Every structure is written in structure tokens, then in C-alpha cells.
Amino acid sequence: MASRILVNIKEEVTCPICLELLTEPLSLDCGHSFCQACITANHKESTPHQGERSCPLCRMSYPSENLRPNRHLANIVERLKEVMLSPEKGQKVGHCARHGEKLLLFCEQDGNVICWLCERSQEHRGHHTFLVEEVAEKYQEKLQVALEMMRQKQQDAEKLEADVREEQASWKIQIRNDKTNIMAEFKQLRDILDCEESKELQNLEKEEKNILKRLVQSESDMALQTQSMRVLISDLERRLQGSVLELLQGVDDVIKRIETVTLQKPKTFLNEKRRVFRAPDLKGMLQAFKELTEVQRYWAHVTLVPSHPSYTVISEDERQVRYQFPIHQPSVKVNYFYGVLGSPSITSGKHYWEVDVSNKRAWILGVCVSLKYNAKWNVLRPENYQPKNGYWVIGLQNTNNYSAFQDAVKYSDFQIGSRSTASVPLIVPLFMTICPNRVGVFLDYEACTVSFFNVTNNGFLIYKFSNCHFSYPVFPYFSPVTCELPMTLCSPSS
């Protein structure tokens, strides 16, 4: 009932021309009302007769000045719109919000469901319309396809979102690691500079103590000389002021003493050439540090493999080896250099490890080629440590003699016309400004190089073997020689 009343009211406030709710309604003398825009357009289309026009519905003539706004209808239209836009106030589900009729038609052009009054309105005039039942299945299929497509796109979007989150997390980790590495490397640089500064200051303090000690001794000598002068002058003054007997008594000895007096000049060091401070080669230090940092990226986990238990002792963690003289054979003369190999074997790539040789008076380390782990544990003489024998090593002997072991040369290479083919061991002396407590070994298999670094001295290069011929698998090599102090493989964090 309420719906029917609402429809009747809508019919009363619907424009006969556009069939829509009245907009700015104008009323004629005949009582009919129209939208201001509709009646104005109608006036332009019709031919006026002596300034009069006719109503589009009843054709009753009226003067154009008699068009008057109908406020009452305008208010009704506003109230009606409020009711139509509020479903809880009376609008039925499935009914046109504008006309209150059932939504039974579908406008293909607008893609909306409409009622029969909407179909006849100017807004939908000429449009293709269908019963909703006729097009529902077609659009349901389309929407189902669209739904599947959107679900797939949603999955893709979620994956992209997850990828971005993962990349973001990865970047955060990388940046955090880079920050840590940068801080660590610059700390190492500062430590290097602090160490160099400390050494220079210590040298300066030693120089100061030495010079001041000598100057104090010189000052003491000058004080004794001055005191002896004072004693002699006092004796002369006493003789000159006393009697003749006092003047002449022992005068010859006094004169001889005066004649033998020689003024000793103090020992000074102004003209001595003292050590002039020179800033350390920071460029070289930084370059060495950069090279060391670069090769340390290839740090390998190396362990020791027992090869001759009678003369070498390996720790339980297989990272330390020391020499042990056989207790049951104390009189046996040791003719061999006993060593052990490291694991794993190397057949490609870049590998780096560090060895602590602190306080040892002798050691040999590097790499060697071998067909099996225990094939080359004994070397008869240090001269046999040669690349042609499969050894690329350096070592320390007699506490201070550092050497690299190169291939031997023949006497005939030095003596013209000599027929001798005897070999001269080529042991290359290595000069260390700072003795290494820790040695880094870097093997580049493809480049055929083996390099040794003095980690104790800021990573300066000790020696480098080039053009190495690796015909078999390569093993790290360690020989404690005959020194009972251990050689220890270092960890990256140590």
C-alpha cells in the first residue's frame, strides 16, 4: 500500500516531457508542471503566436510571463528523493530507486538493471535492453572468468609483494653486513696506524733515554772537571796570600799540575746524525692491507692429516702440529724434515689459510702436490723443497733465517764451458722488517700462483711463486722441522 502511494506521488511530480522527477519545476495556468529546462526547450521548438505558447499536454495557451516556480512541488520532490535513497524508510530490494518499479530489465549500453519506466525515459531511449534472466547466465560466466583471473592476479600480486619484502630483507642484511665489514676494516686500518705510531714513539723514547743518559754522564764529568779546577785555584790563592815558605813549598809540583791541566770538552750530540722520523708508507700499507683483505675472502677450512706419528703430534681438533723426538730412540740422528698435509685436497679455485708460528725457531709451510695424503711426509734435506719436486714453500731456520725454496740451478749455468751437471740449491733469502708471528698462504689454482703474506706486518707480501705446475691435487703443507713449539691453523675470527 505504501509502495503504491509512493508510486502515485512520483507520478504527480514526474515531468511529462523527460519522465524524470521535476527539476526546478515551473507551473502553467492550466495546472500542469514541467522541469524548467524541459519547458524552455519546448518553447524554443514551438512557434509563438503573439507572445503566447501552449501547454505540451492540454494545448491550453498561456503567456510566457505566466510561468511561475512551484516551490511546493520542489519540496515534495526533495522529500521523495530522501525516501527513495533510504531503503530502510520504504524502498524495496530489487526495485528502482528512482521509480519504485521492479528492476526487470538490463541496459546493455549502461551495464545496469533498470525498470520499465527507466527504459522509456530519455536517458535510456534507443538503448538495447533485455530481461535480466536472458543475460544473467552470460554475465555470470564472464564474471566467473574475471573472478578466476583476479584470483590469479591476486596470487601474482601477493608473490610480488613477498618478493619485494624478501628483497628488502636481503638488502637490509647486506647493508648491515657491509656496515659491519666497513667498520671492521677501518678499525683494522686505525689499529695499523696506532701500531705504527706506537712503534715510532717507542723508538723515540729509546733514543731520548739513550741520549739523555749519555748527557747526564757528560754533565757529571764536567762537574768533576770544574771541581778539580776549583781545588787547584784555591791552592794557588792560598800560596799567593801566605808566607814565602808557603809559596815555595812544593811549587814545582803545583806548576807541573797547572801545565798538565787540559780542559775536556763535553760530549754533545748536536752534530750527530740522529734518526729522522719519516711517516710510514701509508700507500704501501693500505695496498698490502687491501690485498690481504681481498685474499681473506677465500678463507678455507683446513685440517691436518696425520702422516708420521713417531715424529709429529697433531692435536685433537686437527688444527695444531708439533715435532716430537722419539722417546724410544733418543740416540737416533734425525736426517729428515717431517711434515703433514692439510685437508681437503685442492684441484681448482682460490684458497687461503693462516698459520700461527709464534716463537718458533724453525718451520716450513706452503703447498705440495701428491697422489695421496701420506706420500710426501719426509724430506731428506731442505734443498729438496723445490717446485720441480712438487713443493712451493717458505720457511725459517736457526731463528732468524727466512728463505724461499726455488728450483736448483746447475753449475754449468755459472761456469762457461763446464761439463758438470751438479745442482746448486737455490734458497732465496727473505728479509723481514717485522718477523711474522702469523703467515697467510693464498693458492690460486687457475692462476698457478702461491703467495705468502706477513699478517703480523699489516699483510705485506713475503714471497710469491708464479707459473706453478700443478699436475696432481694440491695439499697444504706444514713442517714443524725439529722445533717442539706448535704450528697452529688460525680461524677467521681469531
Curated annotation (Swiss-Prot):
Binding annotation for Zn(2+): 96, 99, 118, 124
GO process annotations (BP): activation of innate immune response; autophagy; defense response to virus; innate immune response; positive regulation of canonical NF-kappaB signal transduction; positive regulation of MAPK cascade; positive regulation of NF-kappaB transcription factor activity; protein K63-linked ubiquitination
GO cellular component, one term: P-body
Major location category of this protein: cytoplasm
Region Required for interaction with GABARAP and for autophagy: start-end pairs: 186-199
Location of the protein in the cell: Cytoplasm; Nucleus
UniProt KW Iron keyword: no
Enzyme class of the recorded protein, top EC level: transferase
Zinc finger (B box-type): 91-132
Domain B30.2/SPRY: 280-494
Chain positions with Phosphoserine modification: 86
Gene3D superfamilies: 2.60.120.920, Classic Zinc Finger, Zinc/RING finger domain, C3HC4 (zinc finger)
PTM summary: Degraded in a proteasome-independent fashion in the absence of viral infection but in a proteasome-dependent fashion following exposure to restriction sensitive virus. Autoubiquitinated in a RING finger- and UBE2D2-dependent manner. Monoubiquitinated by TRIM21. Deubiquitinated by Yersinia YopJ. Ubiquitination may not lead to proteasomal degradation.
Domain of life per record: Eukaryota
Coiled coil stretches, renumbered: 131-223
Keywords tagged on the record: Acetylation, Antiviral defense, Autophagy, Coiled coil, Cytoplasm, Immunity, Innate immunity, Metal-binding, Nucleus, Phosphoprotein, Transferase, Ubl conjugation, Ubl conjugation pathway, Zinc, Zinc-finger
CDD domains assigned: Bbox2_TRIM5-like (cd19761), RING-HC_TRIM5-like_C-IV (cd16591), SPRY_PRY_TRIM5 (cd15822)
Subunit structure and binding partners: Can form homodimers and homotrimers. In addition to lower-order dimerization, also exhibits a higher-order multimerization and both low- and high-order multimerizations are essential for its restriction activity. Interacts with BTBD1 and BTBD2. Interacts with PSMC4, PSMC5, PSMD7 and HSPA8/HSC70. Interacts (via B30.2/SPRY domain) with HSPA1A/B. Interacts with PSMC2, MAP3K7/TAK1, TAB2 and TAB3. Interacts with SQSTM1. Interacts with TRIM6 and TRIM34. Interacts with ULK1 (phosphorylated form), GABARAP, GABARAPL1, GABARAPL2, MAP1LC3A, MAP1LC3C and BECN1.
Similarity-based family: Belongs to the TRIM/RBCC family.
Domain notes: The B box-type zinc finger domain and the coiled-coil domain contribute to the higher and low order multimerization respectively which is essential for restriction activity. The coiled coil domain is important for higher order multimerization by promoting the initial dimerization. The B30.2/SPRY domain acts as a capsid recognition domain. Polymorphisms in this domain explain the observed species-specific differences among orthologs.
The protein's name: Tripartite motif-containing protein 5
